[in-house]
Design a protein with these regions (language model features):
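PAPS-dependent sulfotransferases, especially Golgi type II membrane carbohydrate sulfotransferases
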Residues: 1-48, 54-154
Length: 154
């Protein structure tokens, strides 16, 4: 399988949850390599926006995007953002579609915080993930939260 290149043995020996964790780890490494190369080629002129920051505060990011590419926000843009429930009060307040539910999405629990929702998802994953894969997931989460978005702890 092409997306398991250079980690085929881990892929074959892993369960589905571990495969996803290892895939995310490997795609993150590859993305970081390409990002470094692009930054050196383009003098650091790369705009990276986390999904979480965007759905919680889209106006700031839409202004940055439009000024970067020399365009403006249109009514069509605003319509699509409304269809996607952007802005949101919580990241996990996505649009309620059957396809998302089939893939495991659930609306946030009443009175939960962002951290509560992340902890719930981690507990679900931990039931099936191997010990080593869970360590990788926790490392990835920590790195992501340090670099892009940290909802804090209760």
């Amino acid at each position: 399988v092409y997306y398991a290149k250079n980690w085929e043995e881990d892929y074959i020996e892993s369960n589905n949850i571990d495969r996803v964790i290892y895939f995310i780890s490997n795609i993150t490494k590859e993305t970081n390599k390409v990002r470094k190369k692009l930054i050196s080629l383009h003098g650091g002129n790369i705009l990276t926006i986390s999904f979480e920051q965007f759905v919680l505060n889209p106006d700031l990011w839409m202004d940055k995007i439009s000024s970067t590419i020399g365009t403006s926000v249109t009514n069509a843009t605003i319509r699509v953002m409304k269809e996607q429930n952007v802005p949101r009060d919580m990241v996990s307040q996505g649009i309620d579609l059957d396809i998302y539910r089939r893939c495991g999405w659930e609306p946030p629990r009443e009175n939960s915080t962002e951290r509560d929702e992340l902890n719930i998802r981690r507990e679900e994953i931990a039931r099936e993930a191997g010990k080593e894969a869970l360590i990788v997931l926790d490392r990835l989460s920590k790195e992501y939260e340090t670099q892009y978005w940290n909802p804090g702890y209760n």
